[in-house]
């Protein structure tokens, strides 16, 4: 009974707040002569702050046109803007900037939804050792990370040198599918210097603080390191969940002036991989068994950063030099 009453109160409170909000919107329009979309575009700076407010306004609107505008095809955005202007009785000649601002916001909103679909497609595609393209990507990853060490055979214990668990890496991609391989290859290719350093440090990340003699003298546990490829797949999972949950909207809406793409997602993965590596060393874990604790702490820190509407995770990161900060 108590549970039912609690649910009833929550439902009543929801509808009350919704009714109150509509009343406030009506009053504001009468006082300012502008609809909510106009007030947001004219009163909020470009970037995540504006786009997220526009997205909420469109999604919560009672108009079917506005509700569906967040999921239209990119080619239909321009016509959708015209329809919205007509619905709101806004003269585009008198308010030319409004159409431009709305279009920029919709490109980001629709682009984010499409990016989720693209990423999900890669995640759901399993690694297939009979697929020449998949095999080529995997062998390319080895060449990028170990340019001076030939791979003796396709199935080999050498894969452990770059952080896979066994003789055949295909089994390690089960959780994230091709997405994990795409991200690892992107990191190794687009930010080669950092990737090589992270790989080297991952074997024993404290080596930079001690000489080899000191390391052996202190009998340090080499397990303080981690498996580069496995952690890369794990960080891919982190990036994926941040994307699907909407947490990355703040970042993408601030760094992608139009629609965020798969490249933006991969650049974000590079940043997360680099930052996690530094965070791992700072945390100074006792052994690899502390990985889940460190990862969860890192995840919470990233989420906290993304709660800042002005946040852009990697505006100055090497792999992100092509991004434009709005």
Curated annotation (Swiss-Prot):
What is one Pfam family matched by this protein? ELMO_CED12
Identify the PROSITE patterns for this entry.
Answer: ELMO (PS51335)
S-adenosyl-L-methionine as a keyword?
Answer: no
* GO terms under cellular component: cilium; glutamatergic synapse; Golgi apparatus; synapse
Source taxon at top rank: Eukaryota
Q: Using the record's annotation, list all stretches that form the ELMO domain.
A: 133-306
Q: Does Nucleotide-binding appear among the keywords?
A: no
Gene Ontology MF terms: GTPase activator activity
Q: Any idea which UniProt keywords this protein has?
A: GTPase activation
GO biological process terms held by the UniProt record: cilium assembly; protein localization; protein transport
Q: Which InterPro entries match?
A: ELMO_dom, ELMO_domain-containing
Biological role stated in the UniProt entry: Acts as a GTPase-activating protein (GAP) toward guanine nucleotide exchange factors like ARL2, ARL3, ARF1 and ARF6, but not for GTPases outside the Arf family.
PANTHER family recorded: ELMO DOMAIN-CONTAINING PROTEIN 1, ENGULFMENT AND CELL MOTILITY
Q: What is this protein called?
A: ELMO domain-containing protein 1
Q: Which organism is it from?
A: Mus musculus (Mouse)
Q: What is the lineage of its organism?
A: Eukaryota, Metazoa, Chordata, Craniata, Vertebrata
Q: Which gene encodes it?
A: Elmod1
């Amino acid at each position: 009974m108590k549970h039912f009453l609690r649910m009833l109160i929550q439902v009543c409170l929801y509808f009350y707040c919704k009714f109150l909000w509509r009343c406030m919107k009506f009053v504001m329009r009468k006082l300012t002569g502008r609809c909510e979309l106009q007030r947001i575009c004219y009163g909020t700076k470009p970037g995540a702050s504006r786009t997220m407010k526009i997205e909420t306004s469109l999604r919560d609107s009672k108009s079917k046109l506005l509700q569906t505008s967040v999921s239209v095809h990119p080619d239909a955005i321009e016509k959708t803007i015209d329809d919205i202007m007509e619905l709101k009785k806004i003269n585009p000649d008198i308010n030319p900037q409004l159409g431009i601002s709305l279009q920029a916001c919709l490109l980001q909103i629709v682009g984010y939804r499409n990016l989720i679909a693209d990423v999900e497609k890669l995640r759901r595609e399993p690694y297939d050792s009979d697929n020449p393209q998949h095999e080529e990507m995997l062998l390319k990853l080895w060449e990028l990370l170990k340019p001076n060490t030939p791979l003796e055979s396709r199935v080999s214990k050498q894969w452990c040198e770059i952080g896979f668990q066994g003789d055949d890496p295909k089994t390690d991609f089960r959780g994230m599918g091709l997405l994990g391989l795409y991200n690892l290859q992107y990191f190794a290719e687009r930010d080669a210097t950092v990737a090589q350093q992270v790989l080297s440090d991952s074997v024993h990340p404290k080596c930079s603080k001690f000489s080899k003699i000191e390391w052996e003298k202190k009998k340090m546990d080499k397990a303080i390191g981690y498996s580069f490829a496995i952690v890369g797949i794990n960080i891919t999972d982190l990036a994926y969940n941040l994307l699907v949950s909407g947490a990355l909207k703040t970042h993408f809406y601030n760094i992608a002036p139009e629609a965020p793409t798969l490249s933006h997602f991969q650049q974000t993965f590079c940043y997360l991989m680099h930052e996690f590596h530094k965070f791992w060393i700072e945390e100074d874990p006792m052994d690899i068994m502390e990985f889940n604790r460190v990862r969860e702490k890192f995840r919470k820190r990233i989420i906290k950063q993304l709660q800042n509407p002005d946040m852009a995770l990697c505006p100055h990161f090497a792999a992100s030099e092509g991004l434009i900060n709005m």
